[in-house]
C-alpha cells in the first residue's frame, strides 16, 4: 500500500482509542513493527481529565491503516 508522510489514513486497530478515526501520517519508519506515526486532531483519554495534556500521536503498523 506504500503509506507515506502526509497521507490521510483511517485507523483499523479495534483496541485503539482512534479506531475508525482519520489522522495524518507524521513519519514512516520501516525498521520496526509499528513504524507509522500518525497525528490526530483530538487528544486521547489522557487529555480528558481537566487538563489540556494528552496524546495527539500514536504508532501503528501499516497493516492497521487504510488510506482515507
From Swiss-Prot:
Signal peptide: none
Entry keyword Methyltransferase: no
Gene Ontology, cellular component aspect: photosystem I reaction center; plasma membrane-derived thylakoid membrane
Keywords on record: Membrane, Photosynthesis, Photosystem I, Thylakoid
Record's subcellular location: Cellular thylakoid membrane
Location (main, coarse): membrane
GO BP: any one term: photosynthesis
InterPro entries the record matches: Elect_transpt_acc-like_dom_sf, PSI_PsaE
Membrane topology reported for the UniProt record: Peripheral membrane protein
Source organism superkingdom: Bacteria
Pfam families assigned: PSI_PsaE (PF02427)
Function according to Swiss-Prot or TrEMBL: Stabilizes the interaction between PsaC and the PSI core, assists the docking of the ferredoxin to PSI and interacts with ferredoxin-NADP oxidoreductase.
Family per record: Belongs to the PsaE family.
Protein name: Photosystem I reaction center subunit IV
Source organism (scientific name): Prochlorococcus marinus (strain MIT 9313)
